[in-house]
Regions:
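Acidic, low-complexity segments
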Residues: 1-318
Length: 318
């Protein structure tokens, strides 16, 4: 595949459409191997090393997958006959220690209990519990910390109330597509409105209203916060931000023919507190190498050097 900079990534596949090798323009390589069932056995990169996977069927019919990282750390996942992951273990910091976490399901396949991480050799003792109504909607979530979230449903509206161990509460109301329409705590209620695209257009607390406008492409064009002022946004034909106006001043963004930012200027309305002009340069691999310009009358420059694989080997600024 080739991107807009003309940079190529070469990929090969097996007969099943699985990636065998991938090499990018920096000669970073990925090589995968699979078993006869298409399960990943090894994944090797020239920089990170080899990750190995083993698969085991347990006597009760469950499956165990072990992932060995390049430094030989292990991650073990247990899956039941229904394909549900019910336990995972990762190597801990202490020698020969493992940290595990468990999940339990009901007969309908719904997650009803999830443990907090615990050290292998002990048993899970801290659980987060979920209860459902007859429509499989969560109605109560009890966390091990004592925080309880209850949800009630009325038509297309969902009301969720959180109460912690100190009896502090927060209630949120959601519309049919999951947008928060109001939030209430002891400080009061904040109400939210949205447009047809689901974008927030108004947030109201008491008599204070924060409004947001969007252009025909769904891009934020104006933000009006009575406590901070009005912010305006302009874009080019590719949807890239080119100009912002705030109560304090202006910012301009310029892009090259490949869509990369190459110049940024900032100027305050008073003409003195902020005055920046920064130019960015790239190497033939598309990586930033230099930033040069002025900031409030002082020269500014920074640089980044990379190795053949695109990793940063040195950087600095003046």
């Amino acid at each position: 595949k080739t991107d807009n900079l003309g940079i190529e990534t070469n990929i090969t596949y097996n007969d099943w459409g699985l990636v065998l090798t991938q090499t990018d323009h920096l000669n970073n390589t990925l090589t995968n191997t699979y078993d006869n069932w298409g399960k990943l056995l090894t994944s090797k990169t020239n920089l990170g090393g080899t990750t190995t996977y083993t698969y085991e069927k347990l006597s009760n019919g469950d499956a165990k997958v072990t992932e060995y990282s390049p430094d030989n750390d292990q991650k073990i996942t247990y899956t039941n006959k229904l394909g549900q992951n019910y336990k995972s273990s990762v190597k801990g910091f202490a020698e020969n220690s493992y940290v595990s976490q468990e999940v339990q399901y009901d007969v309908l396949g719904r997650k009803i209990k999830e443990s907090e991480p615990y050290f292998e050799g002990t048993s899970a003792s801290k659980w987060n519990v979920t209860e459902y109504d007859d429509y499989s909607r969560p109605i109560k979530i009890t966390q091990y910390t004592g925080k309880i979230t209850t949800s009630s449903y009325s038509g297309r509206t969902v009301t969720a109330t959180e109460t912690n161990a100190n009896n502090r509460f927060k209630t949120q109301v959601f519309d049919a597509i999951g947008n928060v329409t109001s939030t209430t705590d002891k400080g009061g209620t904040i109400e939210f409105k949205y447009n047809a695209a689901g974008e927030n257009i108004e947030s109201k607390y008491d008599k204070n209203v924060v409004a947001t406008q969007y252009d025909n492409w769904g891009r934020k064009s104006l933000f009006n916060d009575p406590s901070n002022g009005i912010y305006q946004y302009e874009y080019n034909g590719y949807g890239q931000l080119i100009h912002t106006t705030s109560p304090k001043g202006h910012k301009y963004y310029n892009y090259d023919e490949y869509g990369r930012l190459y110049n940024q200027t900032e100027a305050s309305n008073d003409g003195t507190s902020t005055n920046k002009n920064i130019t960015i340069t790239y190497n033939n691999k598309g990586l930033i190498t230099n930033k040069n310009g002025t900031s409030n009358g002082k020269a500014y420059s920074s640089y980044v050097n990379y190795d053949a694989n695109g990793r940063v080997i040195s950087s600095g600024e003046n």
